[in-house]
C-alpha cells in the first residue's frame, strides 16, 4: 500500500463509485473520496487503509466540476443521507444509469455487454418526495430529538427540516418529539434497552391520510400525546404501537397494535385504490411508484390466460394491477398484516382470481409447484438482499415463460442475473429514480425464457 493513515495527498477523480463517492488513483492505489465528483482535482486526507484500497476525507477542491451544485440542505455534510446532492440532477440520472453498468461489469451475467440499458427516468421536482419517515428518538439533557444516525456512526443528527422528506410528516415528527418530552415519556437508552426508540410516520399521497407508529420496548401510556396530535393534525387517521425489546438493530418487533383510529389508510396507484396497514411495505416515493409500476406492467406484457406469481407482494400493489388482465394471481409476503391487506384489497376491487399467503417466497413457491401449480408469468420485487438461492433454484428448474425483476439494489440484481440468464434472455433494463439525491436507484428488468 502506497499511502498511510492521515496522509494528505492530491488526487484527480477519474470516476464515481456505486455509493456516489469519487474514485481516483494515487501511486496505483485505489482511493475513495466521498463528496468528490468525476473530473475534479482535490486535496484529501487518508482516513482508512484497507488491503486493496483506501478511503479519504475531502479537504479542498482545487479544480471544481461544472456539474457541482451547492446543496440547499443545511445538514447535508453532517447527515450523509443524500450522498450526491452536490451533483446536478440531470447528471445524477446519468450516474444512476452508469451504476447499473458498473454492477453488470462486476458480476458479468451472460450477454451483459449487449444489454439495452435505458436512461433513468427522473422527477420533475426531486424534493420532499419521501412519504414515509422512520426517525430514531433520543433524549439529550432532557430534550427529545428525532432524526437519523450520521452515516457510519451511532451519533444522532437532529433533523428539523429534511429537503427530501414530505413536509407534513416532517412537521409531525417535530411535534411528536416535543410532546414526548412534554409528557416525559421514557426515551430509548441503549444501556437499559428501554423506552421509545423509533417513530414511523407515513402519508398516503392520494387521500392525504397519515398513520403513525411508536416503536418502544414496552407498552406505554401515549394518550396525552395522541390527544394533542389528533387535535393539531386532522390528517392523522391511525396511531399504532410496535413492541421491540430486542437488542438487535431490527427496527420492528413482532407485535403491532392500533391504539387509536382506523386500522389502515387509503392509497392509490395505477388508478386503483388499496389499504395500507401500519406495518405493510409500500414504496417511499408515491409519485415515482406510478412510473415504476407502469414500467413493470409494460415489461411483463401479460395475456388473459396467464397465471401470475407476485413474489414479495406486500399489500398486492403490483399483482393487483394485473388481476384484471390474467387468469390468476398468486402472491406471498413475510408480513402477515400485508397479506391481510392484499386479501382485503383484492376483495374490495372485486377480484376472485387472487390467492395470497404469508411466508417466504423461497418456501411458498416451491410448495405451490410441488402441489401442481404452474405459473407462466413471474414478477419479483425483493428486498435489497436480492433473491434467495432456494428461490433461484426453483426458477431454474421450472422457469415461467416471462419474468420481470423489480430491483432496489443494482449489485444484488447483477448477481442474480448471473443465475437467471442460464434460462432467460435480458430484453432491457429500465431504471427509475425513486430516491433523488441519493446513490440508490430502482430498476425494472424484462426477461424472456430461452427456447
UniProtKB/Swiss-Prot annotation:
It is an enzyme of class 2 (transferase). The active site is at residue 408. The keyword Iron-sulfur applies. The keyword Oxidoreductase does not apply. Pfam families: TRAM, tRNA_U5-meth_tr. It comes from the Bacteria. Keywords: 4Fe-4S, Iron, Iron-sulfur, Metal-binding, Methyltransferase, S-adenosyl-L-methionine, Transferase. InterPro entries: MeTrfase_TrmA_AS (IPR030390), MeTrfase_TrmA_CS (IPR030391), NA-bd_OB-fold (IPR012340), SAM-dependent_MTases_sf (IPR029063), TRAM_dom (IPR002792), U5_MeTrfase_fam (IPR010280). [4Fe-4S] cluster binds at residues 73, 79, 82, 162. One of its GO terms (molecular function) is rRNA (uridine-C5-)-methyltransferase activity. Residues 2-60 form the TRAM domain. Disulfide bonds: none annotated. S-adenosyl-L-methionine binds at residues 283, 312, 333, 381. Its EC number is 2.1.1.-. One of its GO terms (biological process) is rRNA base methylation. PANTHER family: PTHR11061:SF45, RNA M5U METHYLTRANSFERASE. NCBIfam families: rumA. Belongs to the class I-like SAM-binding methyltransferase superfamily. RNA M5U methyltransferase family. This is Uncharacterized RNA methyltransferase gbs0448.
